[in-house]
């Protein structure tokens, strides 16, 4: 569990490390592509976050406004966010196993 960490906005340069966290947390059938993460950074830059322990990315959050209908399909890019969003959709929140239990996910949310 990290002793100290910071949370900041996700940047395109973070995607490679985000993919490593994703692979450490989820089964192969749920993994999403670098293009998906780049897309979410483009359409919702203020609500895509990462947690860092020093220089190491230990967790991330992808969230954005959405309508209450069906969630977006797995690993599909979005052209834009819905204009009449009525829900805050947490697409993904993941923390490396070694960093779990220290409040990282709560800080991201």
Regions found by a protein language model. Give the residues of each.
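Helix-loop element at the rim of GNAT/NAT acetyltransferase active sites that forms part
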Residues: 9, 20-35
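Conserved beta-hairpin
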Residues: 47-61
């Amino acid at each position: 569990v990290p002793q100290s960490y910071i949370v900041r906005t996700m940047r395109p340069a973070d995607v490679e490390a985000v993919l490593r966290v994703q692979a450490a947390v989820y089964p192969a059938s749920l993994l999403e592509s670098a293009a998906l993460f780049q897309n979410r950074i483009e359409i919702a830059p203020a609500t895509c976050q990462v947690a860092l322990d020093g220089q190491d990315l230990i967790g991330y959050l992808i969230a954005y406004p959405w309508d209450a209908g069906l969630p977006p399909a797995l690993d599909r890019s979005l052209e834009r966010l819905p204009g009449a969003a009525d829900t805050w959709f947490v697409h993904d929140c993941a923390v490396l196993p070694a960093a779990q239990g220290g409040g990282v996910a709560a800080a991201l949310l």
